[in-house]
UniProtKB/Swiss-Prot annotation:
Cellular localization per UniProt: Cytoplasm
Upper taxonomic lineage: Bacteria, Pseudomonadati, Bacteroidota, Flavobacteriia, Flavobacteriales
Function: Catalyzes the phosphorylation of pantothenate (Pan), the first step in CoA biosynthesis.
GO molecular function: ATP binding; metal ion binding; pantothenate kinase activity
Native source species: Christiangramia forsetii (strain DSM 17595 / CGMCC 1.15422 / KT0803)
Major subcellular site: cytoplasm
Binding locations of ATP: D6, G7, G8, N9, T10, F11, I12, K13, T120
UniProt-listed InterPro entries: ATPase_NBD, Type_III_PanK
Name of the protein in its database record: Type III pantothenate kinase
Entry-linked HAMAP family: Pantothen_kinase_3
Length: 243
């Protein structure tokens, strides 16, 4: 039984896997880690191994608690990966992007896959049918665009994102919604079209916190999966058991 931990700036996600099957997922504030960690230990005493991925430095007490309880793998650029990484600067590659590519290798082996993660940033990552990671693109995320428009102008308001805005805005608020939401959706469709023309039988994975607000046509080759990153971390942990 594995414990997967994905640490963000404010929140921590935990997931328990057994035989590659997700048993439970939790999301809580970083300050509430120890309370939730104790509950997890009581509920799942069979956990033996854990993987930790964090975008920030975690409290040393938190790391020590994990090391004391389990065999801990901390994701970094030196960890063995289940794919060939051709990123020119692997030490700068985000851990979330690594996990997403690993999930693509696990779920869609032998296929060309484009993973789109709509989070703080919108990231595009491509792995080939030969299990080679080529890289991708990073674009400003939904919230970042709304906040930037408000911060770097004198009079434009900070607008709350809403799905499916009309194309032609008839007020400042609706114009901002149209420009940002529709603009991102056009970016998504255009990027998918460009990748699709270069890679045969391309499968697209659409994930991330803002994937529910944004909409792209879910054709046969496009799949939404909110647990894709956690599944990728678990696959990396399983892969390293054999190394």
């Amino acid at each position: 039984m594995n414990l997967v931990i994905d640490g963000g700036n404010t929140f921590i996600k935990t997931a328990v896997f057994q035989n590659n099957r997700l048993l439970e997922k939790q999301v809580f504030l970083k300050k509430d880690f120890f309370e939730n960690f104790e509950n997890l230990q009581k509920k799942f005493p069979a956990i033996r191994k854990s993987i930790l991925s964090s975008v920030t430095s975690l409290d040393s007490d938190l790391e020590n608690a994990l090391k004391k309880s389990y065999s801990l793998l901390q994701l970094d650029d030196l960890v063995a990966l289940p794919f060939k990484n051709e990123y020119a600067t692997p030490h700068t590659l985000g851990k979330d992007r690594i996990a997403l590519v690993a999930a693509a290798v696990n779920t869609y082996p032998g296929k060309n896959v484009l993973i789109i993660d709509a989070g703080t940033c919108i990231t595009y990552d491509l792995k080939t049918e030969d299990e080679v990671y080529l890289g991708g693109a990073i674009s400003p995320g939904l919230e970042m665009r709304f906040k930037s428009l408000h911060k770097f102008t004198a009079n434009l308001p900070l607008v709350t994102p809403k799905p499916a805005p009309k194309l032609i805005g008839d007020s400042t608020e609706s114009s901002i919604l149209s420009g940002i939401i529709n603009g991102i959706e056009m970016e998504l469709k255009g990027t998918i079209k460009s990748y699709d023309s270069k890679f045969e039988d391309l499968t697209i994975i659409f994930t991330g916190g803002d994937s529910q607000i944004l909409s792209i046509p879910l054709k046969n080759s496009i799949f939404a999966n909110s647990n894709f990153l956690l599944e990728g971390l678990n696959f990396i942990l399983e892969f390293n058991k054999t190394q």
